[in-house]
Amino acid sequence: MSVQRVKMAGIVAALLGSTVAANAGGFERSSQDFDILFEKGNAVEAGGTFVAPQRKLKNIRGSRVGAATGGINPITRQPYETSVDEAKSYWVPKASAKFDLTDDLACAAQYRQPWGIHTDVGVDTVRMFTAIDQKISSNDYGVNCSYRFAAGEKSYFRILGGVSYQELKGEQTKMIPPGSAFGGTFRIGSLDVEDEAVGWRLGAAYEIPEYAMRATLVYQSKLKYNLEGTIDNLAIVGGRGIPINVESDVDTPQSVEFKFQTGIAPDWLAFGSVKWTDWSSITQVDFDASDNNVIRKGTTITSLNLYYQDGWTVSGGVGHKFNDQWSVAGTVTWDRGTSTGLTSQTDVWLFGLGTNYKPNEQFEVRLAGAAGWLSSGELDDTVVNGKPNLTGSKGEFGNDFVGGLSLTAKVKF
């Protein structure tokens, strides 16, 4: 079996993983990457993934605010629409610079955007009373390292670890009805919060390079945030909105991921992975007044009701190298939805295909695509955690298409 030929297919397998991670459950968009540390030599890699989810909500109904307005939208002066395209397309960049410090120690500086979500339902349906536009964005600046020990004549054991500095930002707009605690007329309020945090990860790997066999297990810690910012246009004084300073404690979830690959025939590689993410730790995110300027400090102004269930992502595939320049790989991935009925984040099935072109030993470019569906279901946030939610509503959605495209280039030196 040609080890180098098999390894090329393994590179394509890693590429397809970037397309899958960019549409994972919860609001994860990019997972940690230790694969580059297993390659020999110094390298710089950069690329990105474009994802286009086509989630459409239908038969939207059941809003108490909508009923109170007689079914007439106060903005358009027309009956409320009952369907809307919810999801927005997005781009996820990623970059790494890897260096061999010794024969056994390697480190990589990395940039990625681990968390993100963007939905926009506009102001035509009663969903605007839950949220009009919601956006979470992030930046991660990290370092991952690997130290290798001999574990036999042809095998190695590695200790993997890393740290990251992360920035997290959350934005939301929603329609405020006159019956809110702050009174006033129909108006759009906005939430804008952000914070920074530090996280870590630790893992181990076992490999037999001659057979392109590798198994890795990595734990990623949760990150603790104290989000701070303002809610605007909620409190009205003298005919104008007064910003309310707010804060919220929230943790991004911990996770454990297992990856495995092995050569199965000359120029053929099989690979797979399983990842668990502790999304059930995120239930209700309260935004409380952080001072006494407008309302008593500690008073909950608004909440983000998620009540997620844990996420599971299972992926498998096969790669093949045709010659010294071209390799291909295909994958099948299932991502369990994190929704418990309050959101439209249901199961995702993805089928991926990618190719790796390497014209010489110093440069290679990878292109991968994935297509699949977001599974059907229903959402109902008229009752949250056993309590009536006056601004909630009900809706349905079918099996909707999702597609992704990833492009990456690498230079070795």
Regions found by a protein language model. Give the residues of each.
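Charged interaction patches that mediate protein-protein contacts
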Residues: M1-S2, G161
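Outer-membrane beta-barrel porins/channels
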Residues: G25, L57-N59, R64-G70, V92, ...
